Amino acid sequence: GRERHIQQGALRYGKQLVSSGRGESSHQEHPFVAIVTPGTDQERGEVYAMHFVYSGNFIGQVERCQFDTVRMVMGINQEEFCWNLKAGEEFQAPEVVMVYSAEGLGEMTRSYHAFYRRHLIRSPYNHKKRPILINNWEATYFDFDTDKLLDIAREAKKDGIEMLVMDDGWFGKRNKDDSSLGDWVVNEE
């Protein structure tokens, strides 16, 4: 992927946006927008950033008007969203986390990391080292059986790896990318 290839441009008049309408966010369309002052780098410059804590359809938009007022908005992409509320029902929208940094992009990143560690990660491993795990996908793709997985687990254990994640192919008749996705019946072959 190209997730570390930052896309930057001048703040033009009118609207500029990043969005996804395919049911997910990803490294292709990430729910993040930042406005920076000219010359901003990792250590210097002002940053105003927004990150949507949601993995579905989204839109992040920046608008500069004729009076040089700038407005940033972010939320669920309304083009692909419909929610009918009945009397007395509630809808809790996903949250947007906003960060301001006067010390560049590095401080913005550290602020996000600290906030998410304190407020979003709900794990017993929030403040301690997480167990090391290995995923069998790159080693086996769809071609694995019990013996092959046990061999991987034994070798991994020698290196201090504590958990094996059995990836795609454990369910249904899933031995290629275009079949059985979502068939959660264990494939014992």
Model region roles, listed by residue range:
Residues 1-116:
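N-terminal accessory beta-strand-rich subdomains and adjacent acidic, glycine-rich linkers
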Residues 68-72, 113-119, 151-155, 184-185:
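Short, low-complexity, polar/charged sequence segments that are solvent-exposed and flexible
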Residues 112-132:
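Long, charged amphipathic helices and adjacent flexible linkers at domain junctions
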Residues 125-189:
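Aromatic-lined carbohydrate-binding/catalytic grooves of carbohydrate-active enzymes
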